[in-house]
Curated annotation (Swiss-Prot):
Residues at which ATP binds: Q86, G104, E105, G106, K107, T108, D508
Name of the protein described by the UniProt record: Protein translocase subunit SecA
GO terms (BP aspect): intracellular protein transmembrane transport; protein import; protein targeting; protein transport by the Sec complex
Entry-linked CDD domains: DEXDc_SecA, SF2_C_secA
E.C. number: 7.4.2.8
Amino acid sequence: MLKIIEKLIGSYSEREIKKILPIVDKIESLAPEYERLTDAELRQKTDIFKERLKNGETLDDILPEAFAAVREAAWRTLKMRHFRVQLIGGIVLHQGRIAEMKTGEGKTLVATLPAYLNALEGKGVHIVTVNDYLAKRDAEWMGPIYNFLGLSVGVIVHGLTSEERRKAYNCDVTYGTNNEFGFDYLRDNMAIYKEELVQRELNYAIIDEVDSILIDEARTPLIISGPAEKSTDLYKRADNFVRRLKPLYYNSDDDKQMPDTTGYDYIVNEKRHTVALTEEGIKKAEKYFGVTNLADPENATLHHHIIQALKAHALMKRDRDYVVKDGQVIIVDEFTGRLMYGRRFSEGLHQAIEAKEGVRIERESRTLATITFQNYFRLYKKLAGMTGTAKTEEQEFREIYKLDVIEIPTHKPMIRIDHPDKVYKTEKAKFEAIVEEIVETHKKGQPVLVGTVSIEKSEMLSEMLKKRGIKHEVLNAKHHEKEAMIIAKAGQKGAVTIATNMAGRGTDIVLGEGVAELGGLKVIGTERHESRRIDNQLRGRAGRQGDPGESRFYVSLEDDLMRLFGSERIKRLVESLGLPDDQPIEHKLLSDAIEKAQKRVEARNFEIRKHLLQFDDVLNKQREIIYSQRRKVLEGENLRDSILNMIDELVDYKIKVYTGESPHPDDWDIKGLLQDLKFIFLDGELSEQDARNMTKDELKEKLISIAKEKYLKKEQEVGELMRELERVVLLRVVDMHWMDHIDAVDQLREGISLRAIGQKDPIVEFRFEAFEMFDQMIKRIQEDTIKIILHANVENMPKRERVVKEMYENSPSDAPVRKSVVKTQKVGRNDPCPCGSGKKYKKCCGAV
């Protein structure tokens, strides 16, 4: 029904493009006028546009002229002129949307249009790429356009100094990777001096390969961490223990029909990527480690280590999920097959794999600052993205990032032939058929690009081709420069290139001489990915800019996708046909089944990401509060009134804790109150007896008076340095407590799923307890700040310095040291919400 309506009124993208076309016509109509301008006159347009913006015109008002200026500048500097479809793409990006443009349609050039226009406001534009090589390449390649028009261009790559970074961020347009932009944001929010800040306000970002960054890497946390003091011995013991256990593999989604676990020690569900000890496994663990009850909270760390060891053995496969190289465990990116140097699996899984592989176990690390890409990129005032494949994830872009996806038509018609899948019963038969196909195609001289899902599979296929004497290149994407070079040659006559799925993304495959007559590039997929988008990316390597090309996927019933998500009906159908292993099966039912399996996995992964975002949003809200307050302190806000206000709030809170609701002094814990305040500011100024003879209000007034008197005395002692002392202390205290809070919230998140057993919504419970913990953290910050300021030794006045001098980055990092979460005083339903919104708790974060 939907398709019939679309035929009548056009798709959403077609309708939106129709609205844009008059603007495109206007840009094109300006071409003759701009061609007549001298270089100086064209350059002067930038100053004119800036002046018009100052006088009240909007970016939309000057868009046609600004785009016309960029178009002409591109021709004069690079001999490249934006096509009509590229102008459409540029407008879509300026509107804060995602432009889906096929491979080879010139996305890099398209970005110069909205980047120039938005840079005219003087607030900076970030163009985000997936690796350092592309960031440098694009900045150097497109730089002359911006420079010609009088704008500066910077590039942020790994290894730059703070000064170099600051200079790059102060440019009008800054190219860089998602990792570098994110880490700089975190580092800025750990800075102790204002002069250490490198980033400006996050204004406008254009993300290249937006699906890779906002979908595939959405759950990847950027973590700045420092080493934690923790023994690695338990990882070895847990590893020795799980080697003795017997697994039961069970891949059903039905929780009600659990299998008989008699004789098995743990269950592995590859589909859900989970492991769990059985009753027998729990008994063995209790005996092996000498504990009476593994489920006891005091054994939570032990249980966590056992589960990570089970995951390392049952779910994590060498040469698929990771490789062991030079005595180190290195992660393999599941989407690109790249080795991810410097990254580590989180929550102790990396150490568990190190124990399994018998290499040196690195110490766990402590999280100092963290943010996910999802939350980092949502900080920008305006966000846009480009990719060849976004339509399948349109719902996710809209729901999570409020980003529309607009399909941009190709400059020339697409003539690539996409053949139906060939399905085999066994993996062995499938790979033999692939080798035959490569051999036959190679005889004609037609280039072949073979996409594999893992390093292990690409090396296996390489061995098979060597035996047949076929010269080929294997691309496991260890070096981006080499990768781009190999991929660029993949379109030459007779070339055979094996590459893990999306290696070389961002580099065009240009057809060599005479290749178009042979049918163009042939793309062979050795397995269907669980995401249709990744398959489409591989297909998109052929048939760029109207070139000929063809693609085909080879599938076996032993592939992970079919094994875990294919239906039993399909397996029965294949068995009933009784065909030999080496005969391919072609049936519409099979093609439909593969697509249904992919859609099922995509929907499941989206739900997981959405669910995790609900948890992450809680910490994100708190992070925004802490970082914004921290920035005010850093930028020199006078803290005197804030400190005096802290004294009022602290005394009020302490009196509530030690006197409760009772109006009778006999029910109050005066001794406890005075003892507690002794560590903060009291020094015998108030006796227990005198305190007992006061009302609550009198007691509060007296204590506040004593504290403020101490504060004023310290102010006189220190003189001008008091403001600096306040800043030093507050920044130190906030950073230390924020680190502890990240740890505590992480641990709460791990244990909260158990609440579902008690018929409670884990999200609601998590939200409530996390804000309760946040409220307690704020109180601890107030207490420690007052205590340290009032007891500061003025002679040894501290200089502002980093809370942790040596930091190292892991993305994603290992889990921090866990601290047990202490249950704290509850927030009342009618109390102000601890998130700082000003609303009552029941109307804000406590709303169910």
